[in-house]
Amino acid sequence: METVDTSQRLARLRELMKERNVDVYLVPSEDSHQSEYIAPCDGRREFISGFSGSAGCAIVSMTKAALSTDGRYFNQASKQLDNNWLLLKRGIESMPTWQEWTAEQLEGGKVVGVDPSLITASDARSLSETIKRSGGSLLGVQENLVDLVWGKDRPCRPSEKVTVHPVEFAGKSFEEKITDLRKELEKKKSAGFVVSMLDEVAWLFNLRGNDIPYNPVFFSYAIITPSTADLYIDEEKLSADVKKHLGDKVSLKPYTSIFEDAKALGQSAQAEVNGGASDPPRKFFISTKASWSLSLALGGANKVEEVRSPISDAKAIKNDTELEGMRACHIRDGAALTKYFAWLENELVNKKTVLNEVEASDKLEEIRSKQKNFVGLSFDTISSSGPNAAVVHYKAERNNCSIIDPEAVYLCDSGAQYLDGTTDTTRTLHFGEPTEKERKAYTLVLKGMIAIDTAIFPKGTTGFSLDTLARQFLWKEGLDYLHGTGHGVGSYLNVHEGPIGIGTRVQYSETPLSVGNVISDEPGYYEDGKFGIRIENIIMAREVKTTFSFGERPWLGFEHVTMTPLCRKLTDPSLLNDAEKKWINEYHSEVWEKTSGYFAEDELTRNWLKRETQPI
């Protein structure tokens, strides 16, 4: 991982701040749609700080600069940040939050500036209150200052073609989805909903794009009212097939006209109030993740209502077609991973081939690309050997990566986009003789993964409540990991999908798990500079039968869909109880049954799979 000298960039940014009377400038990670993964043109935080992780916030004052990120990226950030930057480790008690650190810089009534399109309206309000208590004020700076520093070197905004996602994969027409949304809006007496999240627009209209790497979304907004459906998108992105798909049920408008139209809607609502309507005027809804800019355009906090997105909740509960697609694509994807691991072991151990991390991941992509319905990867493959496996979101650079050491742990976290689903699988392997500590760590992580997989819980339980099941065995040894245990997964959409998850984030306590949720199960353990362990399966929430039904509530459990062998060499059977051994043996029997047919004429892979799925 290379460190970028940010001195000149910071100096130029501070010049621009001074010209605009801004004392502290915030650079969030997100784009104007609050996307977790962004297009290169929106990589402002990475440009100004040198840190390339997917989460974090940069804060620049006239004399200092700080970068806040979470536990997934502590190791990576410490390597990528140069001496201009202070690393604020989120969640560490001795460290201030980035909001607290910002407030500490504000003595004497200073001004904090931020691009209002890059933070949510609710975050702007809470940040403003924090800043006020320190004597400062928050200013929305319409012109993005990092863009000015970046200048002509900033990548252009993508404008890739949009495609139709057929109902044979979506399971429901876009007309039905809009009808369902309108019913929800009517229940809440809303004038309409402004859709700002890219995956929500894609899901609602059964469309997919390619504007953000690995995420099949496209730059757009939408406004849905009781009688209209407007899609804000650059029309050159739309083929004749897409226009035919939308028909006369959707009005197409330029992407950049959303704020002008939002302002007009806000003024119309205000005119209704001024006209003394007998009924309370209906407000437009925006998601709690919508930008401060969008809220201001609609008239601000008193004129617009921020709500949990009804689209986000609907999208998280997969229909039967989507669930069947997830099962099918994970079998094919599991076969691809099995072929890759068999190939990799043969190259490293039998042929003594020298392979680096990128060469290996290239081979995996080649194998995956031959699978039915393959579209592309769902994220940048994490192919990490030895100490690199301790970097949770490690990225091997093509011209600067490690040779895979057969005598060290190898962690591979990878996934793909298929027309019928999205995959995300992590396996940790060893091609030599693992140490006792590596085997123990792996087995403790495996026990946690099994505990989530086999959990049974009453309807209404959240992922926040389940999280300790995955950590309990590590905790007994005084060990832990600094990332969530699971995230929601889209259906040929974003591999990280809200609002559900398993972990300690506040939002995971707000959304109960429901039948049809698709979520990852991925505990881990990492020792900086030594090795890392992570095991990840994708699981789907379903209703289960129990002997009793306390409170007459439905009870839920999980169905795993990932079909890839676990690592026998790293598993210590002496640390497993009988139920866990039974689970592993039954899982491996299922993997063999569902994937071995792919290798009828591939003796190498078939033999590897047979060996790895033998009972323990």
From Swiss-Prot:
Manganese keyword on record: yes
EC id: 3.4.11.9
Enzymatic reactions: Release of any N-terminal amino acid, including proline, that is linked to proline, even from a dipeptide or tripeptide
UniProt GO molecular function: metal ion binding; metalloaminopeptidase activity
Binding site for Mn(2+) 2: D413, D424, E536
Source domain of life: Eukaryota
Coiled-coil regions, chain positions: none
Metal-binding keyword on record: yes
Chain residues that bind Mn(2+) 1: D424, E522, E536
Co-factor note (free text): Binds 2 manganese ions per subunit.
GO BP, one annotated term: proteolysis
Keywords: Aminopeptidase, Hydrolase, Manganese, Metal-binding, Metalloprotease, Protease
Pfam family, one: Creatinase_N
Entry GO CC: cytoplasm
CDD domains on file: APP
SUPFAM superfamilies from the UniProt entry: Creatinase/aminopeptidase, Creatinase/prolidase N-terminal domain
Cofactors: Mn(2+)
Function statement: Catalyzes the removal of a penultimate prolyl residue from the N-termini of peptides.
Record family assignment: Belongs to the peptidase M24B family.
The protein's name in its UniProt record: Probable Xaa-Pro aminopeptidase P
Organism: Paracoccidioides brasiliensis (strain Pb18)
